[in-house]
């Protein structure tokens, strides 16, 4: 394939755009995330509250949600959040104070999410969105802040949501619904997309199949 053909297909074909642009894009994003982690000040307030909220189960053996709280208020996130951030607390020195390893983990989550989003677009092949727009995936300053400076649970929830979307695009209904359930367990606002998921299941496998798939998930 000549260079002119590649350029033409980059403008018209999502699969070609993902094949040629995704790897350099993710590499550049990892370099940018590294610079941000090393040069920008970490935002402690949300992370500190998260660590306080999971301190009860980890340190005191308290699993009663009514007693779990941080400096920003009571714990409002589902059980998957508690398990995830308890694990991240261990990664952060056991008490949540050594944040740098966690920032690298979140940078990896960011890269994986970019890859999944690009994969979903390649499978969907939207006709009204030009393939070169994959370059705009990394244009948000706020996303970089959320992923490597604030360490929000949204990052993990969206990773699992886009994994679910990718699996559903490939017709892997049970695995897709399982990934979707895990996303909901980390942040419940993922449930806002549940009506769309239900419609897809009804169209693909019918009412009985949708019930069977939901039981597996």
Specify the residue positions occupied by each region the protein language model found.
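Multi-pass membrane glycosyltransferase architecture that uses lipid-linked
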Residues: 2-217
């Amino acid at each position: 394939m000549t260079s002119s053909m590649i350029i033409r297909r980059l403008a018209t074909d999502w699969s070609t755009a993902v094949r040629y642009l995704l790897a350099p894009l993710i590499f550049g994003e990892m370099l940018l995330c590294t610079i941000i982690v090393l040069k920008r000040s970490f935002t402690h307030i949300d992370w500190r509250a998260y660590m306080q909220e999971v301190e009860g189960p980890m340190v005191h053996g308290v699993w009663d949600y009514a007693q779990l709280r941080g400096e920003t208020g009571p714990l409002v996130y589902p059980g998957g959040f508690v398990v995830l951030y308890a694990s991240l607390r261990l990664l952060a020195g056991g008490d949540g104070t050594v944040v740098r390893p966690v920032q690298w983990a979140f940078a990896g989550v960011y890269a994986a999410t970019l890859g999944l989003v690009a994969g979903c677009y390649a499978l969907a092949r939207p006709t009204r969105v030009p393939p070169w727009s994959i370059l705009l995936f990394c244009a948000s300053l706020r996303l970089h802040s959320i992923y490597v400076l604030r360490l929000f649970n949204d990052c993990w929830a969206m990773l699992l949501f886009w994994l679910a979307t990718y699996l559903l695009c490939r017709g892997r209904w049970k695995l897709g619904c399982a990934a979707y359930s895990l996303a909901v367990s980390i942040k419940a606002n993922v449930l806002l997309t549940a009506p769309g998921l239900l419609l897809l299941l009804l169209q693909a496998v019918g009412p009985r199949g949708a019930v069977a798939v939901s039981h597996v998930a």
